[in-house]
């Protein structure tokens, strides 16, 4: 068993090519057989590019206001909202303009991400 406390001080600016705009991330749980947990903090208007994962993904919004999009459908999300994205579905997520947004991303331990287009 492992207990991890998520603190803002653990966030680091991300240089990953999937992001558009300023985004901070921190890996919370990694190295598990089946799951990985990452905290992602999108600054106002920042988002990621449309992409897919090889495993299902769950996003749990913890702060702010954001948008999750897939297949032409865009939904506003706020703290307490949970988004389920099936493996292989092209999607994107990020902060609504004028707002920051933080979510926890729960992915399969072996999940691979592919940026679309």
Model-identified regions with their sequence ranges:
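A short, N-terminal "cap"/entry segment at the start of jelly-roll beta-barrel domains
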Residues: 1-35, 114-117
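Conserved short histidine dyad/triad with adjacent acidic residue
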Residues: 22, 38-53, 87
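A short hydrophobic beta-strand segment most commonly corresponding to one strand
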Residues: 37, 84, 98-116
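Short, conserved beta-strand element in jelly-roll/cupin
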Residues: 40-43, 52-68, 106-108
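Structural motif
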Residues: 58, 65-67, 74, 90, ...
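Short acidic-glycine-tyrosine-enriched beta hairpin
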Residues: 72-88
């Amino acid at each position: 068993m492992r207990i991890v406390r998520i603190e803002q001080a653990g966030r680091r600016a991300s240089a990953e090519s999937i992001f558009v705009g300023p985004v901070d991330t921190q890996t919370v749980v990694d190295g598990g057989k089946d799951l990985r947990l990452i905290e992602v903090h999108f600054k106002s208007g920042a988002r990621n590019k449309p992409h897919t994962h090889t495993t299902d993904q769950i996003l749990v919004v913890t702060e702010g206001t954001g948008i999750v999009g897939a297949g032409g459908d865009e939904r506003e999300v706020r703290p307490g909202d949970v988004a389920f994205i099936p493996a292989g579905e092209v999607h994107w997520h990020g902060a609504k303009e004028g707002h920051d947004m933080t979510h926890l991303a729960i992915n399969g331990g072996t999940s691979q991400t592919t940026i679309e287009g």
